UniProtKB/Swiss-Prot annotation:
Paired cysteines (S-S): none
Gene label: malE
UniProt EC number: 2.5.1.-
Keyword Transferase: yes
GO molecular function, one term: prenyltransferase activity
PANTHER family: INDOLE PRENYLTRANSFERASE TDIB-RELATED (PTHR40627), PRENYLTRANSFERASE ASQH2-RELATED (PTHR40627:SF3)
Sequence positions that bind substrate: E92
Family: Belongs to the tryptophan dimethylallyltransferase family.
Protein name per its UniProtKB record: Prenyltransferase malE
GO biological process: alkaloid metabolic process
Enzyme class per UniProt: transferase
A Pfam family recorded for this sequence: Trp_DMAT
Biotechnology: Malbrancheamides have the ability to inhibit calmodulin, calmodulin-dependent phosphodiesterase (PDE1), and induce both endothelium-independent and endothelium-dependent relaxant effects, suggesting their potential as vasorelaxant agents.
Residues engaged in binding dimethylallyl diphosphate: R106, K192, Y194, K259, Y261, Y346, Y411
Protein species of origin: Malbranchea aurantiaca
Length: 438
């Protein structure tokens, strides 16, 4: 494999926002939708073009983004801060790279309305149910059963919301309950659901382990997985806390994966190794090889090691950078009738120098034999943010996730700050900017 997942043309060879410009002439927007579209759609178009999605797929996915997401990002400028990003932005674009496979572009977002965070909808429930109805109409393979079930089990209802009286997740600024993820694959769209159970734990006085056990047990016979193994380890290692969350595929329950996410401030290799191996319980060749490659990536991106000061507050330019530190995140992916979970790590690169991170990734790609991707990657990421200097910024690359199996090899995703709005003052003395959208 020499060309690598990105193909052989650089993004400078084409007009990477051509589809965005064309659609902008004909789509109709409210004032809020217009703001979100022009601040986010150009970047999505650039990412799709860089990942070699042909022009027809670019049109398809940008129209989907307009129809399913832009109308549900809430007021612009935003008022409700979403838990899905460190800045509180309710949308996040990422790209997944695998051996011998085209890159896959993904969209994560939390549906928001003008009521989100107000007394009428303090925990942002109403918009999610509307999006479920929309997806049921426009996505033939979308199955809402697990979304509806887990939201009922793991998020607060109206009575519980009233009891909480607008309180945040313990010690934080967070209130989010649900979110969605979209994988843009081969002309289709795979949908994932997310739930953030902290408020449910808070009001019910149940532990997260208790809530998850009850939810999983309620699906026995149609959604069987090795939850007990993960639950025991998460309890023992302190993996559960108020920032933990879960996700699942919005497909027939018997075919869905279930992921349990942990969040921790101990960003050290010793902790990573313990989590990756379930405290030494997982020792297969697959686990050992994955850990070896994970250590290589850890070394190349040169992540600052140590105890982080993350408390659940947003890094949104209202704090003079005091909340820039991000925690380590990981998940255990549970598949039906599979006795062992698959670990995935999310390195917290928000707050690290962007050029250092991008160059480290390029070296990792080079070591995998993804030559063209490695050669063009710094230029490609720079083209995503033409108004920014990656040598000076610290928040344009947000997360790097990594998993490994013998079947698929390296499974790596890069998550980006996904708006032309730049909230922060950089070390170069830039003023808080609004970007030009394209």
């Amino acid at each position: 494999m020499t060309a690598g997942p990105m193909g052989n043309k650089s993004t400078s060879d084409i007009d990477s926002v051509l589809v965005y410009k064309s659609l902008s002439r004909y789509l109709k927007f409210s004032e809020n939708e217009e703001g979100w579209w022009h601040k986010t759609a150009p970047l999505l178009n650039k990412i799709l073009a860089a990942a070699k999605y042909d022009v027809h797929l670019q049109y398809r996915y940008l129209v989907f983004y307009y129809a399913a997401c832009v109308s549900a990002l809430g007021p612009y400028p935003q008022r409700f801060s979403s838990s899905i990003t460190r800045s509180g932005l309710p949308v996040e674009f990422s790209v997944n790279y695998q051996n011998n496979s085209k890159p896959i572009v993904r969209i994560g977002y939390e549906p928001i309305s003008h009521l989100s965070g107000t007394e009428r909808d303090p925990y942002n429930h109403k918009t999610a149910s509307e999006i479920v109805a929309t997806l049921s109409k426009i996505q033939p393979d979308f199955d809402p059963r697990l979304f509806n079930y887990f939201v009922h089990q793991l998020s607060v209802n109206k009575a519980e919301s009233d009891v909480l009286n607008g309180a945040n997740v313990e010690g934080s600024e967070m209130k989010s309950q649900t979110a969605f993820g979209f994988d843009l694959v081969n002309g289709e769209i795979s949908v994932k659901g997310y739930a953030f159970p902290a408020m449910k734990c808070q009001v019910s006085q149940q532990s997260l382990s208790q809530l998850l056990k009850a939810a999983i047990n309620g699906l026995k016979g149609e959604f069987d997985c090795a939850f007990g193994l993960v639950d025991e380890y998460m309890e023992r290692c302190g993996g559960y806390n108020q920032f933990s969350f879960v996700s699942w595929d919005c497909v027939v329950p018997a075919k869905s994966r279930f992921k349990v996410y942990g969040v921790h401030n101990d960003v050290t290799w010793k902790k990573i190794e313990d989590i990756w191996t379930l405290g030494g319980q997982a020792t297969s060749g697959n686990v050992t090889k994955g850990l070896e490659l994970l250590k290589e990536l850890w070394t190349l991106i040169d992540l600052d090691e140590g105890e982080r000061g993350y408390t659940g507050r947003f890094d949104d330019a209202n704090d003079n950078g005091s909340n820039i530190q991000s925690p380590m995140v990981w998940n255990y992916e549970l598949r039906p009738n599979n006795p062992w979970p698959l670990a995935k790590f999310y390195f917290p690169v928000h707050g690290e120098n962007d050029m250092k991170i991008v160059k480290g990734l390029a070296r990792f790609f080079e070591n995998r034999g993804w030559t063209e991707l490695a050669r063009s990657y710094v230029q490609t990421v720079s083209s995503f943010f033409p108004d920014r200097d990656l040598n000076q910024t610290q928040r344009l690359v947000s997360w790097i996730s990594f998993a490994y199996t013998e079947k698929t090899g390296v499974y790596l995703s890069v998550y980006y700050h996904s708006s032309a709005d730049y909230l922060w003052i950089s070390e170069s003395g830039e003023k808080r900017g609004q970007g030009d959208g394209a």
